[in-house]
Amino acid sequence: PLNKDGSICEPEAEKMLDTAIASGVTYIIDTAYPYHNGDSEPFLGRVLKKYDREDFFLATKLPVWNVNTLDDTKRLFQEQLDRLQVEYVDFYLLHCLNKEKWQKVLDLGLIPYFEEMKAEGKIRYFGFSFHDDYEVFETIAMGFLSDSV
């Protein structure tokens, strides 16, 4: 639920999340760093901290367009964990990949870094969301498969 200005209507959104969790819904959260002008992750962190982390599945995404170095990526990933007030995310995606962003992922060495985060237990499943031609999708998918992500 949103307010008239497009911001999150926090009381209503919290009530909706509480109802979903009380009703047994476990996969309820799909967010990303820029959602709702950057307010989605902090809001969810505040609301979800009252629940056991194992009670829900959480997905968020790296805004690849906002990183220019591996250090940017590391900082942003940690910031997302902090904003969400969690030690790990269930599903972590490279957001809105296309041909140019995929090349950036390769150039910056992001996949080995996120494999390391998986090994450390900070990410359970790693993947990508996609916005380009099918041939580019195949290239990205094969890149993920060859790296055993």
Please describe what each predicted stretch is.
Residues 1-5, 57-63, 93:
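N-terminal small/glycine-rich loop or linker at the start of catalytic domains
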Residues 1-55, 113, 119:
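N-terminal binding-site loop/beta-alpha segment at the start of enzyme catalytic domains
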Residues 8, 65-149:
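Glycine/proline-rich, positively charged
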Residues 30, 61, 90:
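Acidic active-site catalytic centers that drive phospho-/nucleotidyl reactions
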